[in-house]
């Protein structure tokens, strides 16, 4: 299963999880979802099998999709856009330089990326203005999981 892994040294990775249920002391968190959409820079050959990539509103093929990947330097890459298939999302991340990538949320109700406390910001802001959920989404109880990315101090 595709897994976003955060390690105690501050690094992150996206990889196929093949380890035991207990990941060990080096792992700070792990977020799993479906198979990898990119591995070794190559598209998953099953990207055209719509049933593998989540249920869409109204059985639409092209919907809001988000994904995350890592490049050769270990940098984290995020992509989100409307009107995407699993394959087109994988292509976006591949062209951005991802070697490994996974799909995150799909459908307009769930794809969310908000900035909190950005330098000079007076309030939270959305990555893309067409993302439907409010910027306060994760500042109050929510029925979906989420994770946060913080900048390293002094870096």
Language-model region placement:
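Gly/Ser/Thr/Pro-rich low-complexity, intrinsically disordered segments
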Residues: 1-155
